[in-house]
Amino acid sequence: MLYWLYQYYGVNIFSYITFRAGVAFFVAFGLSVFFMPYFIKWAKAKKANQPISTYVAAHEGKKNTPTMGGIVFIISMICASLLCGNLFNPYVLLGLFCISCFALIGARDDYMKISAKNNAGMSAKMKFFLLFIVSLIITSILLYIGHNTNFYIPFMKYPLFDMGAFKIMDISVLALGFWVLVFLATSNAVNITDGLDGLATMPSICALFSLSAFVYVAGHAGFSSYLLYPKVVDSGELVILSVALIGALFGFLWYNCHPAQVFMGDSGSLALGAFIAFMAIVSNNEILLLLIGIIFVIEALSVILQVGSYKYRKKRIFAMAPIHHHFEVQGWAENKIIVRFWIIAILANIIALLSLKIR
């Protein structure tokens, strides 16, 4: 809406993405901080508590903590984006569609867990099906609007090959399949990581900050040309959505830091992972995402290795998976695990940002 003040009334300051992103940050932060206590109070009254695993004794004290806090920061982000974003931009509309759909799937899963008072939730097949369908819709729209299908290796100037060249019945199946995989992997990896107070929140903020920088450069003719970065027309507006989400996450972290007063639930973690994947795809950073989201990669790999090892060797690699539970079983304090993982995420994203210049 603020963009319309520039478009129709010539208020030039609202033409700047950076200014509107700053406004979006504080609006989303304010909404998240203000409404979260009301949500916590309502959730406690409704007994919308996170079912706690009986396998981790240290989590016994978390049993009455409400979940689904992701709904608040997602709505805060959407409101700020609607206020500050250019609603005629296809990437903005697709980004809002992406985060909304994944949040709804996560909310349904949370509701089923709360109703059943266990961690089962939606069946794995149904959850995968819904995530797959939404991912397929989003990636199909990206192809329809002509998004760049080049495959880039981090720190390299030129693409390795064009995924769009591999077609079946005039459909770029390689690009489509690869992007769907990125969506599914990232959304589930963030979901797995969300097991300690604030553990998924700060790495998500770091990832969104880095991806905001990449998307801004991609959408800026001057910067993309100077840095030899692949230009993506109109993508710069996504910075407003990303920065709004960062602001909303800081507001959530105010209540989610140890000891947490609220958990984000699947409604938050699935939506977060999906939006991070979306930003990575738009900025052509699907491979660099392995570094940008290194904590999510480590957490997901620990589960894959644990399950695979037990299935084929009948032996466990870790005391418990995901790996943050392994460290808990080893006697690490929760705060120590969280802060050390945050440090790893910050350092990894600093290295990732170097790829803007080192190409």
Curated annotation (Swiss-Prot):
The keyword Transferase applies. One of its GO terms (cellular component) is plasma membrane. Its cofactor is Mg(2+). InterPro entries: Glycosyl_transferase_4, PNAcMuramoyl-5peptid_Trfase, PNAcMuramoyl-5peptid_Trfase_CS. Pathway: Cell wall biogenesis; peptidoglycan biosynthesis. It is an enzyme of class 2 (transferase). Coiled coil: none annotated. It is a multi-pass membrane protein. The keyword Coiled coil does not apply. One of its GO terms (molecular function) is phospho-N-acetylmuramoyl-pentapeptide-transferase activity. It catalyses: UDP-N-acetyl-alpha-D-muramoyl-L-alanyl-gamma-D-glutamyl-meso-2,6-diaminopimeloyl-D-alanyl-D-alanine + di-trans,octa-cis-undecaprenyl phosphate = di-trans,octa-cis-undecaprenyl diphospho-N-acetyl-alpha-D-muramoyl-L-alanyl-D-glutamyl-meso-2,6-diaminopimeloyl-D-alanyl-D-alanine + UMP. Signal peptide: none annotated. The chain crosses the membrane at residues 23-43, 68-88, 92-112, 126-146, 165-185, 198-218, 235-255, 262-282, 287-307, 336-356. It is found in: Cell inner membrane. GO terms for biological process: cell division; cell wall organization; peptidoglycan biosynthetic process; regulation of cell shape. Keywords: Cell cycle, Cell division, Cell inner membrane, Cell membrane, Cell shape, Cell wall biogenesis/degradation, Magnesium, Membrane, Metal-binding, Peptidoglycan synthesis, Transferase, Transmembrane, Transmembrane helix. Its EC number is 2.7.8.13. HAMAP family: MraY. Belongs to the glycosyltransferase 4 family. MraY subfamily. Catalyzes the initial step of the lipid cycle reactions in the biosynthesis of the cell wall peptidoglycan: transfers peptidoglycan precursor phospho-MurNAc-pentapeptide from UDP-MurNAc-pentapeptide onto the lipid carrier undecaprenyl phosphate, yielding undecaprenyl-pyrophosphoryl-MurNAc-pentapeptide, known as lipid I. This is Phospho-N-acetylmuramoyl-pentapeptide-transferase. It comes from Helicobacter hepaticus (strain ATCC 51449 / 3B1).
